[in-house]
Amino acid sequence: MALEQNQSTDYYYEENEMNGTYDYSQYELICIKEDVREFAKVFLPVFLTIVFVIGLAGNSMVVAIYAYYKKQRTKTDVYILNLAVADLLLLFTLPFWAVNAVHGWVLGKIMCKITSALYTLNFVSGMQFLACISIDRYVAVTKVPSQSGVGKPCWIICFCVWMAAILLSIPQLVFYTVNDNARCIPIFPRYLGTSMKALIQMLEICIGFVVPFLIMGVCYFITARTLMKMPNIKISRPLKVLLTVVIVFIVTQLPYNIVKFCRAIDIIYSLITSCNMSKRMDIAIQVTESIALFHSCLNPILYVFMGASFKNYVMKVAKKYGSWRRQRQSVEEFPFDSEGPTEPTSTFSI
């Protein structure tokens, strides 16, 4: 779901009052959330800017190298390329949410729907491509290596991942809108029961976290066990990489999905019974979802830059860029005394 932290609004605890995905019909007071909004105005722009800059640099390099330099690709390469594209599209939505936290939504209702849908689509597809990578690594270690390379099944899997993410982003296209306070939030119609709203939350948790986490956990566990049984193979580094991947996934994704699960349960059973509890829930969503977004910065490091082959491609790019820079500098070099003898001189650059 598109940045849920931006849904922090004042709401009235009266019967029939609907605000975003929340329905606090048991409340009898007014909860003023100005302090939550002030926290978001400071925290979100800073954190999202850091994520955007780091993630854009890393994932852009991954896409560029796979697109222009690495022509011979494996299935894992295809999944990593799709993961980097998903992360980039996700990152491109972050400036809009940073502005939304400070100034409100200024781009209109249509852009609110599109940006929210893109956010969910790429967040979910990224998690699913992580699961695909774990399956391919499991097959590579435990099965007989295949010489067929990237085949039709690989592209079918990628298509299915994107379609599943698109389907899960449809609620964002339908329900997200700009409210009276100029905030891009989901507003559900009154005829839509609390069970349906909770179901949407649970689907996001299951497809975007639980299923990928279970697949990654099982595949990497079997892969690690297989590596430890292999004779005459140095396994310390592969095991460290696998362990790092799992730990980073848990640390970045588990807190956010726990908070989402608590909120889904609250939608049905109205567990939040005070204004302070509601504020703490809003801040928890802001912080945990921001941490979850940071995973898009770490994906290039975890899945690409740790590989020796990709490092070689990076070195080739660096050498080519260095050679280009040297050639350009040599063209720009000229002696300060144009009539004097030719000799090495200082370069002049802007």
Swiss-Prot record:
Atypical chemokine receptor that controls chemokine levels and localization via high-affinity chemokine binding that is uncoupled from classic ligand-driven signal transduction cascades, resulting instead in chemokine sequestration, degradation, or transcytosis. Also known as interceptor (internalizing receptor) or chemokine-scavenging receptor or chemokine decoy receptor. Acts as a receptor for chemokines CCL2, CCL8, CCL13, CCL19, CCL21 and CCL25. InterPro entries: ACKR4, CCR1-9-like, Chemokine_rcpt, GPCR_Rhodpsn, GPCR_Rhodpsn_7TM. Glycans are attached at N6, N19. It comes from the Eukaryota. Belongs to the G-protein coupled receptor 1 family. Atypical chemokine receptor subfamily. It is a multi-pass membrane protein. The Ser/Thr residues in the C-terminal cytoplasmic tail may be phosphorylated. The chain crosses the membrane at residues 43-63, 88-108, 114-134, 155-175, 202-222, 241-261, 290-310. GO terms for biological process: calcium-mediated signaling; cell chemotaxis; chemotaxis; G protein-coupled receptor signaling pathway; immune response; positive regulation of cytosolic calcium ion concentration. GO terms for molecular function: C-C chemokine binding; C-C chemokine receptor activity; chemokine receptor activity; scavenger receptor activity. This is Atypical chemokine receptor 4. Residues 1-42, 109-113, 176-201, 262-289 are extracellular. It is found in: Early endosome; Recycling endosome; Cell membrane. Residues 64-87, 135-154, 223-240, 311-350 are cytoplasmic. It holds the Pfam family 7tm_1. Forms heteromers with CXCR3. Interacts with ARRB1 and ARRB2.
